[in-house]
UniProtKB/Swiss-Prot annotation:
This is Sulfoquinovosyl glycerol-binding protein SmoF. Part of the ABC transporter complex SmoEFGH involved in sulfoquinovosyl glycerol (SQGro) uptake. Binds sulfoquinovosyl glycerol (SQGro). Can also bind sulfoquinovose (SQ), methyl alpha-sulfoquinovoside (SQMe) and a short-chain derivative of sulfoquinovosyl diacylglycerol (SQDG). Cannot bind D-glucose and D-glucuronic acid. PANTHER family: ABC TRANSPORTER PERIPLASMIC-BINDING PROTEIN YCJN-RELATED (PTHR43649:SF34), ARABINOSE-BINDING PROTEIN-RELATED (PTHR43649). 6-sulfo-D-quinovose binds at residues 41, 303-304, 373. Its main location: periplasm. It holds the Pfam family SBP_bac_1. Induction: Induced during growth on sulfoquinovose. Binding of ligand results in a large conformational change in the protein, and complete enclosure of the ligand. 3-(6-sulfo-alpha-D-quinovosyl)glycerol binds at residues 40, 71, 95, 141, 194, 248, 303-304, 373. It is found in: Periplasm.
Length: 416
């Protein structure tokens, strides 16, 4: 993995000043903190928030370290650092599925006495392990359906509410456009964390759960249906033949280049779609993900958290920094400047936020009802089982029926 250190002194607006009055307090003496930030989630914008923190907290310098374009790559790196009890990292940005793992391993410090009631309940729950607060929310997230608003309008099509409707819409537009580079749908088929959500979306839509009370609750029919659905997009020519090689940011890049009609992706993609180099600027709509026929529309809960390394030699300074980064003012700043969904309900009605990103006004119900992936200390094994199976089916290595059978067998060994 290639790692890089980002330093900068870009100035922020006044949006964070009120927060800094709270967090300036007594200065720490010559403390340099290192924070690991997901390279996919706007480290340049986080840098601006950190610059303001430095400006108001004399004696504290913060260095950003990034690495890895997927949740798995980042987790692999952090697992190596934490297993070695390395003190070089003070603050860790963790995928919402990781706090339980890291806390169980003894890799994060607790935030004793912290009140999480101001945050969205889902994230308060995700960061509480065995009654202890082990991390604080960085930003919320859910999967959404991005679509080419201009093309749907051109062909008189409404945003689809079922996957069957999406197929029909894709066929109509693709036939009409006669553009061999235009895909109907892009989603995550590579053996990454996104493929876990790929599998669960139709599975959940049938009203099924995967784990209950820590025990496997596998529904074979729903699993086969899910795998068949995704494979059918490839077989019907709606999705590219090598979808098994497509990761989250590949979907984002292809949609941004104007080569995709519908895309399943997270909120971070919005800012990229509206950028100067985007081919779809002002042509993008956002909707809830479709349902299977007769099922419910549902989505996969995402989001990232900030934890303090148990091996940091600057515990107080690191916790102060995390309190700041998890504050409502920083959450608002990141929503406006990076299109990262807030972890505070009030910000979804904030005039400054909705003026900049209007669709955020309708995003709260989606985030609040999003379903979480299984929470278990053995999540890595659960994830690896699901994503490799999805990838194998999409690559044509196994049938949906064989994939579901193999998935159940492997999961039963993990979740006994």
């Amino acid at each position: 993995m290639t790692l890089k250190t980002i330093r900068g002194k870009a100035l922020m607006g006044a949006a964070l000043c009120a927060t800094m009055l709270t967090f300036s307090g007594q200065a720490f003496a010559d403390a340099e903190l290192k924070i690991f930030v997901s390279s996919q989630h706007q480290p340049d914008i986080w840098r601006k928030a950190l610059d303001q923190y430095e400006a108001k907290t004399p004696g504290v310098k913060v260095v950003i370290e990034t690495g890895g374009n997927t949740s798995e790559m980042q987790a692999q790196y952090l697992n190596t650092v934490m297993s070695a009890k390395d003190s070089s990292l003070d603050v860790l940005m963790l995928d919402v599925i990781r706090p339980a793992q890291f806390a169980t391993a003894g890799w994060t410090s607790d935030f004793s006495g912290k009140d999480l009631s101001a945050y969205l309940p889902t994230y308060a729950e995700a960061n509480t392990v065995n009654g202890k607060i082990v991390a604080l929310p960085a930003f919320a997230d859910s999967m959404f359906l991005y679509y080419r608003k201009d093309l749907l309008d051109k062909y008189g099509i409404k945003p689809p509410t079922t996957w069957d409707e999406l197929k029909e819409a894709s066929k109509k537009v693709m036939e009409g456009e006669k553009n061999p580079e235009l895909q109907g749908l892009s989603f995550q088929g590579k053996a990454i964390e996104g493929a876990v959500c790929t599998f669960l979306l139709p599975y959940w839509s049938e009203g099924k759960s995967l784990v209950e009370n820590g025990k496997l609750n596998f529904d074979n029919k729903a699993a086969v249906d899910s795998l068949k659905l995704w494979k059918s997009f490839v077989d019907d020519g709606i999705s590219k033949k090598n979808i098994s090689e497509v990761a989250t940011d590949d979907t984002r890049k292809e949609f941004q280049a104007g080569k995709v009609l519908f895309a399943v992706n997270w909120s971070y993609a919005w800012t990229h779609f509206q950028g100067k180099e985007s081919q779809v600027n002002d042509k993008v709509g956002v909707a809830r993900l479709p349902a299977v026929k007769g099922g419910e529309q549902t989505t996969c809960l995402g989001g990232w958290e900030f934890g303090v390394s148990a091996y940091s030699k600057q515990q107080d300074e690191a916790k102060k920094l995390v309190e700041y980064l998890s504050s409502q003012d920083v959450s608002k700043f990141m929503a406006i400047n990076a299109a990262l969904l807030p972890t505070y309900a009030a910000l979804y009605k904030d005039a400054d936020v909705t003026k900049t990103i209007p669709w955020f006004a309708d995003a709260l119900p989606v985030v609040e009802t999003a379903k979480a992936r299984p929470v278990t200390p053995r999540y890595n094994e659960v994830s690896e089982t699901i994503r490799t199976t999805v990838n194998g089916v999409l690559a044509g290595v196994m049938t949906p029926e064989d994939g579901a059978k193999q998935m159940e067998s492997r999961l039963r060994r993990v979740l006994r």
